[in-house]
Curated annotation (Swiss-Prot):
InterPro entries: Ribosomal_L11_MeTrfase_PrmA, Ribosomal_PrmA_MeTrfase, SAM-dependent_MTases_sf. The gene is prmA. Methylates ribosomal protein L11. Keywords: Cytoplasm, Methyltransferase, S-adenosyl-L-methionine, Transferase. This is Ribosomal protein L11 methyltransferase. It catalyses: L-lysyl-[protein] + 3 S-adenosyl-L-methionine = N(6),N(6),N(6)-trimethyl-L-lysyl-[protein] + 3 S-adenosyl-L-homocysteine + 3 H(+). It comes from Campylobacter lari (strain RM2100 / D67 / ATCC BAA-1060). GO terms for molecular function: protein-lysine N-methyltransferase activity. SUPFAM superfamilies: S-adenosyl-L-methionine-dependent methyltransferases. One of its GO terms (biological process) is methylation. It is found in: Cytoplasm.
Amino acid sequence: MQTHYYELFFQTDKEYLDLFLDLVFSLDIDAIEEKNDGVYIRSEEDIKLIQIALQSFHQRLCEKFNTKIYFHSTLEKKENKNWIEEYKKGIQALTIDNIHIHTTWQKPKQDKINIIIDPALAFGSGHHESTYTCIEFLQKYTDGSKFCLDVGCGSGILSIIMAKLGAKVQACDTDELAIVASKENAKLNRVSFNDIWVGSVNKSLHKYDIVVANIIADILIILEKDLKEKTKEGGILILSGILNKYEDRIKDKFKDLTLLETKYKGEWLSLAYKKETK
């Protein structure tokens, strides 16, 4: 074991955190830990280049959304303790109704549907408030008769849950590394997808009983027409990754659909809509 390790810490606005995490999880990093005060990245290798990549990504986001986005980071060299084991101790298994999400080093629950996700190797583990409420919706609306699409699949956790519930599942993400992560996690959980591709919802030639999109509000608005188009008449559209302050904005964009339910957790919310038959 080396005598020192490097710890990179960063903070950003909550509505953009998932975009930064997508970048971080796509890199070869030993351990990533998300806490209330921000995100910690630890490695025995110097990670200065990761800090530079995050700073550059921040600048590009500000330009893309034409707004000021808060970002702060620090990089420290620290005395090495067995930080990988300490990191593992800090990761808690999570039970959401009948779904139990755990890591490869934690035990499954015999009476639950078990989902294996290692947070350091994925784009999402279920602990985020928006993912949590999304999973609650999926358990309510998904069954073996459904044809489903996961838009912005990240780690594949939502796709895997739908597959475990018996649905026929397709998934997409604009990040090629997310597709790789989803496929690896599907294999780990012994499920398969009907199709998965690099790109967005508009590449699909199908319509679905359930479309789920757990992505930030700005992207949901950009994809509004495609999300509605790919939802079958009588189908369910689940939107998540929405900060409470954007609730009215999102509801206004999707007001032509029937709002079935709103779930709140912390500063985030998820919405379940039905596309009525004309």
